Regions:
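Accessory, often C-terminal, charged low-complexity segments
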Residues: 2-10, 30-231
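A phosphate-binding catalytic loop at a beta-strand-loop-alpha-helix junction
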Residues: 11-30, 140
């Protein structure tokens, strides 16, 4: 199907009504048949509940999205099992994102709206129900970093460090990070760095972190401001 509609080897195919994910399966099969094909896919589907398929409900599928995800998993597994030699490097993985509002509270207020005993409520502008991955992927979107890039995690001094694509972006969102954590992040020679404001016990700690990256990566003052983001 896809080979007949004019798509090229490196195209991204977007299916805005993906249903049971037929498009994803077709692209993976095409990539498996043609080793020069690196087509990617993006599927969009409303999380519509299943109502008229009792057998699917019995198997634990609650929405059309559930069926689509399972189809992608099974199709990828089958493709690799049928052609293990030629599909060893074939990427059949995928990530699932749910559309939501932004990660930040609206803390914009006029001076008249502020009360002295309420100022502490505005110190943290990140919504309380957001986790590290919410913040990480939100920053990736803001920075234009591909959401499909490989990602790793490691724990240093009890704090989790996230590394995207071997250093395209390195992030830590834990509170009061130590010098060892900062050095471990700098050792990755990242292009971009993200911290949460609560990573720092005091403002002086931010300055020390900036200096660490300047020395390790030979960044100028302008590059530090550009490449390090505190949210």
């Amino acid at each position: 199907m896809l080979s007949l509609i004019g798509s090229n080897e490196n195209d991204i195919i977007l299916d805005f009504f993906s249903g049971s994910a037929t498009t994803a399966q077709s692209i993976m099969e095409l990539n498996a048949e043609n080793t020069d094909s690196y087509r990617k896919w993006i599927l969009v589907q409303i999380e519509e509940e299943i109502q008229d398929h009792p057998e699917a409900i019995k198997k634990g599928y609650k929405t059309i999205c559930d069926i689509g995800k399972e189809r992608i998993r099974r199709a990828g597994k089958k493709i690799k099992e049928e052609s293990p030699l030629t599909t060893a490097d074939l990427d059949t993985g995928f990530r699932v994102f749910r559309l939501d509002e932004g990660n930040y509270e609206d803390v914009k207020r006029s001076p008249k709206e502020f009360k002295q005993d309420q100022l502490d409520l505005f110190l943290n502008n990140i919504k309380t129900d957001r986790n590290d991955l919410d913040l990480l992927f939100g920053c990736m979107l803001d920075w234009g970093v591909q959401l499909s890039l490989p990602m790793t995690q490691e724990v240093v001094d009890g704090k989790t460090i996230y590394t995207v694509n071997d250093g395209d972006l390195v992030a830590c969102f834990a509170e009061k990070v130590s010098e060892d954590v900062v050095k471990a992040m700098a050792e990755k020679m990242p292009l971009r760095v993200i911290f949460r404001d609560s990573c720092f016990a005091q403002d002086a700690d931010k300055i020390n972190i900036y200096e660490t990256f300047k020395q390790k990566l030979d960044w100028s003052d302008q590059e530090v401001v550009k490449n390090i983001r505190v949210i």
